[in-house]
Amino acid sequence: MERVCKTEDIVEQRGMVDANDMADTKRTMTETLSRLYDHRKEAGALLDLLDGEGKITPLIEKGVQKILERVNGRIMEDDPFFAYFYLQLDHQLRTDIASPTASNFKGGRYCLYINPYQFLSLPMEQMKNAIKHEILHILLQHMSRANILKKSYDSYVVNLAMDAVVNNYLQDMPRDAITVPYLNERFSLELKPFRTLEYYASKLQAAYDQLKADKDGQDTQSQEVDQELSDIEGESDQDQGGDPVEYTFNAERT
Protein backbone atom coordinates (compact mmCIF):
# COMPACT_ATOMS: atom_id res chain seq x y z
CA MET A 1 0.00 0.00 0.00
CA GLU A 2 1.46 3.33 -1.06
CA ARG A 3 2.38 5.58 1.82
CA VAL A 4 0.75 9.00 1.81
CA CYS A 5 3.24 11.77 2.42
CA LYS A 6 1.92 13.85 5.28
CA THR A 7 2.58 17.51 5.91
CA GLU A 8 4.43 16.57 9.10
CA ASP A 9 6.85 14.41 7.11
CA ILE A 10 7.59 17.23 4.70
CA VAL A 11 8.21 19.68 7.54
CA GLU A 12 10.50 17.18 9.29
CA GLN A 13 12.51 16.53 6.14
CA ARG A 14 12.73 20.23 5.38
CA GLY A 15 13.94 20.85 8.93
CA MET A 16 16.71 18.29 8.50
CA VAL A 17 17.83 19.93 5.26
CA ASP A 18 17.77 23.38 6.85
CA ALA A 19 19.80 22.12 9.81
CA ASN A 20 22.41 20.63 7.49
CA ASP A 21 22.54 23.81 5.45
CA MET A 22 23.00 25.86 8.61
CA ALA A 23 25.82 23.60 9.79
CA ASP A 24 27.56 23.88 6.42
CA THR A 25 27.12 27.65 6.42
CA LYS A 26 28.50 27.94 9.96
CA ARG A 27 31.51 25.81 9.05
CA THR A 28 32.17 27.88 5.93
CA MET A 29 31.91 31.13 7.89
CA THR A 30 34.31 29.81 10.52
CA GLU A 31 36.86 28.85 7.87
CA THR A 32 36.45 32.21 6.14
CA LEU A 33 36.93 34.15 9.37
CA SER A 34 39.99 32.06 10.14
CA ARG A 35 41.53 32.93 6.79
CA LEU A 36 40.65 36.60 7.19
CA TYR A 37 42.36 36.72 10.58
CA ASP A 38 45.32 39.07 10.36
CA HIS A 39 47.92 38.22 12.98
CA ARG A 40 50.22 41.12 12.14
CA LYS A 41 48.65 43.69 14.46
CA GLU A 42 48.65 41.26 17.37
CA ALA A 43 52.20 40.11 16.59
CA GLY A 44 53.39 43.70 16.30
CA ALA A 45 51.99 44.54 19.73
CA LEU A 46 53.77 41.54 21.24
CA LEU A 47 57.06 42.54 19.60
CA ASP A 48 56.71 46.04 21.06
CA LEU A 49 56.02 44.50 24.45
CA LEU A 50 59.08 42.25 24.10
CA ASP A 51 61.27 45.23 23.29
CA GLY A 52 59.90 47.09 26.30
CA GLU A 53 60.19 44.24 28.78
CA GLY A 54 63.44 42.81 27.46
CA LYS A 55 62.33 39.34 28.51
CA ILE A 56 59.52 36.82 28.05
CA THR A 57 56.76 37.56 30.57
CA PRO A 58 53.61 35.46 31.25
CA LEU A 59 51.59 38.01 29.27
CA ILE A 60 53.88 37.70 26.25
CA GLU A 61 53.87 33.91 26.53
CA LYS A 62 50.07 33.89 26.58
CA GLY A 63 49.93 36.19 23.54
CA VAL A 64 52.36 34.08 21.52
CA GLN A 65 50.44 30.93 22.46
CA LYS A 66 47.25 32.52 21.15
CA ILE A 67 48.92 33.25 17.81
CA LEU A 68 50.32 29.71 17.69
CA GLU A 69 46.81 28.35 18.17
CA ARG A 70 45.63 30.48 15.25
CA VAL A 71 48.49 29.27 13.09
CA ASN A 72 47.75 25.65 13.95
CA GLY A 73 44.10 26.27 13.11
CA ARG A 74 45.20 27.34 9.64
CA ILE A 75 47.39 24.25 9.36
CA MET A 76 44.40 22.12 10.39
CA GLU A 77 42.45 23.36 7.37
CA ASP A 78 45.12 22.20 4.92
CA ASP A 79 47.14 19.48 6.68
CA PRO A 80 45.28 17.94 9.66
CA PHE A 81 48.10 15.45 10.24
CA PHE A 82 50.61 18.23 10.96
CA ALA A 83 48.10 20.06 13.14
CA TYR A 84 47.43 17.01 15.32
CA PHE A 85 51.15 16.24 15.51
CA TYR A 86 51.78 19.81 16.68
CA LEU A 87 49.35 19.27 19.56
CA GLN A 88 51.49 16.37 20.80
CA LEU A 89 54.61 18.53 21.11
CA ASP A 90 55.78 20.48 24.12
CA HIS A 91 56.21 24.19 23.36
CA GLN A 92 58.71 26.62 24.79
CA LEU A 93 59.68 30.21 24.00
CA ARG A 94 63.42 30.86 23.69
CA THR A 95 65.33 33.92 22.56
CA ASP A 96 68.72 32.19 22.31
CA ILE A 97 68.10 30.27 19.08
CA ALA A 98 69.16 31.67 15.72
CA SER A 99 65.99 30.73 13.83
CA PRO A 100 62.24 31.34 14.25
CA THR A 101 61.69 27.72 15.34
CA ALA A 102 63.74 24.77 16.53
CA SER A 103 63.09 21.29 17.88
CA ASN A 104 64.72 18.85 20.26
CA PHE A 105 64.06 15.58 22.09
CA LYS A 106 64.03 16.28 25.80
CA GLY A 107 62.67 14.41 28.81
CA GLY A 108 61.17 11.66 26.69
CA ARG A 109 59.21 14.12 24.52
CA TYR A 110 59.79 16.28 21.48
CA CYS A 111 59.79 19.99 22.17
CA LEU A 112 59.12 22.80 19.70
CA TYR A 113 61.05 25.97 20.50
CA ILE A 114 59.82 29.36 19.32
CA ASN A 115 61.99 32.46 19.07
CA PRO A 116 59.28 35.13 19.43
CA TYR A 117 61.45 37.90 17.98
CA GLN A 118 61.83 36.05 14.68
CA PHE A 119 58.63 34.01 14.59
CA LEU A 120 56.31 36.97 15.16
CA SER A 121 57.94 38.80 12.25
CA LEU A 122 56.94 36.10 9.75
CA PRO A 123 53.90 36.20 7.44
CA MET A 124 51.23 33.60 8.24
CA GLU A 125 52.25 31.17 5.47
CA GLN A 126 55.85 31.20 6.67
CA MET A 127 54.70 30.60 10.25
CA LYS A 128 52.85 27.52 9.03
CA ASN A 129 55.90 26.35 7.09
CA ALA A 130 58.17 26.88 10.09
CA ILE A 131 56.08 24.56 12.26
CA LYS A 132 55.67 21.94 9.53
CA HIS A 133 59.40 22.13 8.84
CA GLU A 134 60.23 21.15 12.43
CA ILE A 135 57.68 18.34 12.41
CA LEU A 136 59.25 16.94 9.24
CA HIS A 137 62.68 16.99 10.92
CA ILE A 138 61.18 14.90 13.73
CA LEU A 139 59.32 12.47 11.46
CA LEU A 140 62.43 11.85 9.36
CA GLN A 141 64.55 11.24 12.49
CA HIS A 142 67.01 13.90 11.45
CA MET A 143 68.39 14.43 14.93
CA SER A 144 69.78 10.92 15.29
CA ARG A 145 70.77 10.58 11.63
CA ALA A 146 72.58 13.93 11.68
CA ASN A 147 74.66 12.87 14.69
CA ILE A 148 75.94 9.92 12.66
CA LEU A 149 76.56 11.93 9.50
CA LYS A 150 78.47 14.66 11.35
CA LYS A 151 81.17 12.13 12.12
CA SER A 152 82.00 12.05 8.40
CA TYR A 153 80.72 15.36 7.04
CA ASP A 154 81.00 19.02 8.03
CA SER A 155 78.19 20.09 10.34
CA TYR A 156 76.99 22.94 8.13
CA VAL A 157 76.84 20.58 5.14
CA VAL A 158 74.65 18.15 7.09
CA ASN A 159 72.40 20.99 8.24
CA LEU A 160 71.97 22.20 4.66
CA ALA A 161 71.15 18.65 3.60
CA MET A 162 68.50 18.28 6.32
CA ASP A 163 66.79 21.48 5.27
CA ALA A 164 66.90 20.47 1.61
CA VAL A 165 65.10 17.24 2.48
CA VAL A 166 62.25 18.76 4.49
CA ASN A 167 61.77 21.77 2.23
CA ASN A 168 61.06 19.37 -0.64
CA TYR A 169 57.67 18.85 1.01
CA LEU A 170 56.80 22.50 1.67
CA GLN A 171 55.23 25.05 -0.65
CA ASP A 172 55.38 28.84 -0.92
CA MET A 173 59.04 28.98 0.04
CA PRO A 174 61.14 32.10 -0.64
CA ARG A 175 63.46 31.84 -3.61
CA ASP A 176 66.58 31.73 -1.43
CA ALA A 177 65.27 29.29 1.18
CA ILE A 178 67.38 26.14 1.47
CA THR A 179 65.74 24.10 -1.28
CA VAL A 180 67.10 21.76 -3.94
CA PRO A 181 66.84 24.42 -6.71
CA TYR A 182 68.59 26.95 -4.49
CA LEU A 183 71.45 24.57 -3.66
CA ASN A 184 71.80 23.59 -7.32
CA GLU A 185 72.24 27.24 -8.20
CA ARG A 186 74.48 27.95 -5.23
CA PHE A 187 76.87 25.05 -5.83
CA SER A 188 76.41 24.51 -9.59
CA LEU A 189 75.02 21.03 -8.91
CA GLU A 190 72.27 18.87 -10.37
CA LEU A 191 70.70 17.51 -7.19
CA LYS A 192 67.49 15.54 -7.61
CA PRO A 193 64.41 16.33 -5.49
CA PHE A 194 62.99 13.95 -2.88
CA ARG A 195 66.22 12.07 -2.21
CA THR A 196 67.66 10.93 1.11
CA LEU A 197 69.52 12.99 3.67
CA GLU A 198 72.62 10.91 3.02
CA TYR A 199 72.42 11.63 -0.73
CA TYR A 200 72.32 15.39 -0.23
CA ALA A 201 75.04 15.36 2.42
CA SER A 202 77.40 13.42 0.15
CA LYS A 203 76.85 15.68 -2.87
CA LEU A 204 77.08 18.90 -0.86
CA GLN A 205 80.23 17.78 0.95
CA ALA A 206 81.95 17.14 -2.39
CA ALA A 207 80.99 20.63 -3.59
CA TYR A 208 82.13 22.20 -0.33
CA ASP A 209 85.45 20.35 -0.45
CA GLN A 210 85.98 21.67 -3.97
CA LEU A 211 85.43 25.22 -2.76
CA LYS A 212 88.00 24.70 -0.01
CA ALA A 213 90.46 23.28 -2.55
CA ASP A 214 89.93 26.34 -4.74
CA LYS A 215 90.67 28.52 -1.73
CA ASP A 216 93.93 26.67 -1.02
CA GLY A 217 94.99 27.19 -4.62
CA GLN A 218 94.46 30.96 -4.46
CA ASP A 219 96.88 32.22 -1.84
CA THR A 220 96.80 35.88 -2.82
CA GLN A 221 93.34 36.28 -4.33
CA SER A 222 91.10 34.16 -2.15
CA GLN A 223 88.77 36.83 -0.73
CA GLU A 224 85.93 35.82 -3.04
CA VAL A 225 86.22 32.15 -2.11
CA ASP A 226 86.51 33.08 1.58
CA GLN A 227 83.27 35.02 1.30
CA GLU A 228 81.63 32.09 -0.49
CA LEU A 229 82.62 29.69 2.29
CA SER A 230 81.49 32.16 4.96
CA ASP A 231 78.11 32.57 3.26
CA ILE A 232 77.59 28.82 3.04
CA GLU A 233 78.39 28.29 6.71
CA GLY A 234 76.10 31.17 7.61
CA GLU A 235 73.21 29.72 5.61
CA SER A 236 73.25 26.41 7.44
CA ASP A 237 72.03 25.79 10.96
CA GLN A 238 74.45 26.46 13.76
CA ASP A 239 76.09 23.33 15.10
CA GLN A 240 74.90 23.04 18.68
CA GLY A 241 75.64 19.41 19.47
CA GLY A 242 72.69 18.17 21.49
CA ASP A 243 70.81 21.45 21.16
CA PRO A 244 67.83 21.99 18.90
CA VAL A 245 67.77 21.33 15.18
CA GLU A 246 66.98 24.77 13.89
CA TYR A 247 64.76 25.88 11.08
CA THR A 248 66.77 28.02 8.67
CA PHE A 249 63.86 29.99 7.24
CA ASN A 250 65.16 33.49 7.86
CA ALA A 251 62.58 36.17 8.56
CA GLU A 252 64.45 38.50 6.23
CA ARG A 253 64.02 36.12 3.32
CA THR A 254 60.60 37.23 2.11
Where are these regions (language model features)?
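Short, functionally important secondary-structure microenvironments
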Residues: 1-129, 135-254
